[in-house]
Amino acid sequence: MGKEKLILAYSGGLDTSVAIAWLKKDYDVIAVCMDVGEGKDLDFIHDKALTIGAIESYILDVKDEFAEHFVLPALQAHAMYEQKYPLVSALSRPIIAQKLVEMAHQTGATTIAHGCTGKGNDQVRFEVAIAALDPELKVIAPVREWKWHREEEITFAKANGVPIPADLDNPYSIDQNLWGRANECGVLENPWNQAPEEAFGITKSPEEAPDCAEYIDITFQNGKPIAINNQEMTLSDLILSLNEIAGKHGIGRIDHVENRLVGIKSREIYECPAAMVLLAAHKEIEDLTLVREVSHFKPILENELSNLIYNALWFSPATKAIIAYVKETQKVVNGTTKVKLYKGSAQVVARHSSNSLYDENLATYTAADSFDQDAAVGFIKLWGLPTQVNAQVNKG
């Protein structure tokens, strides 16, 4: 009788490479690597998995699906965990889990393995998502079970013919996709240490950024960015292009001490140039086009959605319901913003929309004013009536 098939979420790094060598004793390991826009050498990763002992190796290009079905709902909801973090890693985990489950069904695998440790958020995100999609699948986490130190991993790797990554002495732990780059560990673990320039990978230092501002126009249709400077492109290409444009101006650097799902605080360095520009630009079109009641209520749901995504509940009915509400609000979010990029700052300096609720004739203080100021007297009387009655009844 043959071995059981196992799907491994494979990154090409030391942890998951060692996992192949360890797991192949008991399983037929099928390595699956998802391209979410991190810019890795995917051909090398594919071949490396086979060299170590995987029976099959797959590279899945999911950039477009990731952008359309995971990043876009987060953008439209201005999803920022603790009002600071655009959920870079948290957004990619659900689609990775989804593809792992699909590959398990396609290949007849009964088990899924991931390379997360026992103290991070991602173990929860993967396992909760997999359970939501197929509760019958078994999930194992070799790195969490081993509790090995890096030196022990290296010893095992050398003894079992696992190639040692060239950047193994890099003190940082980095995760990247098209929505941004996350960095932790090393000197960053002390929150008093300023992040050194070497900790950044996709943004220039604002001090070294160009001395001249750059202006770009971003066009939205139904809340989705569709063009930069009138050049239409797919959402994934637009985000990747904007990462380069805004990154060279030092935009999107975030230094955040966050509350992890597992109960500890963690200091993270994020680089999210495209995300920060798009979030600012999208909000400005909403400010033009949404009625006041939606503008005031939507942020409440945005905060809740940010927490749900961060806390591993992408496939929760609550998440689905909030995303549906947000999608309904986006029907009128059409227009163009002009964004000034300059030394770490992305400032929206102009905006227009065919659905704009801004009426210059109502807002102006010039002779063109069409606002009926005489109506203010009755409005104030009725608006303030509850306050007036309360004051009369409860004097002092």
Curated annotation (Swiss-Prot):
Catalysed reactions listed for this entry: L-citrulline + L-aspartate + ATP = 2-(N(omega)-L-arginino)succinate + AMP + diphosphate + H(+)
Residues annotated for ATP binding in this entry: 9-17, 115
Record's keyword terms, sorted: Amino-acid biosynthesis, Arginine biosynthesis, ATP-binding, Cytoplasm, Ligase, Nucleotide-binding
Residue sites binding L-aspartate per the record: 117, 121-122
One GO-annotated biological process of the protein: urea cycle
Positions contributing to L-citrulline binding: 85, 121, 125, 173, 258, 270
Enzyme class: ligase
Annotated GO MF terms: argininosuccinate synthase activity; ATP binding
InterPro entries recorded: Arginosuc_syn_C, Arginosuc_syn_N, Arginosuc_synth, Arginosuc_synth_CS, Arginosuc_synth_type_1_subfam, AS_cat/multimer_dom_body, Rossmann-like_a/b/a_fold
UniProt-listed Enzyme Commission number(s): 6.3.4.5
GO CC annotation terms, alphabetical: cytoplasm
Main location: cytoplasm
Keyword Cytoplasm: yes
Pfam families associated with the record: Arginosuc_syn_C, Arginosuc_synth
Involved pathway(s): Amino-acid biosynthesis; L-arginine biosynthesis; L-arginine from L-ornithine and carbamoyl phosphate: step 2/3
Subcellular location: Cytoplasm
Family stated for the protein in its record: Belongs to the argininosuccinate synthase family. Type 1 subfamily.
Subunit and interaction comment: Homotetramer.
Alphabetized NCBIfam families for the sequence: argG (TIGR00032), PRK00509.1 (NF001770)
Protein name, as recorded: Argininosuccinate synthase
Organism classification: Bacteria, Bacillati, Bacillota, Bacilli, Lactobacillales
Gene: argG
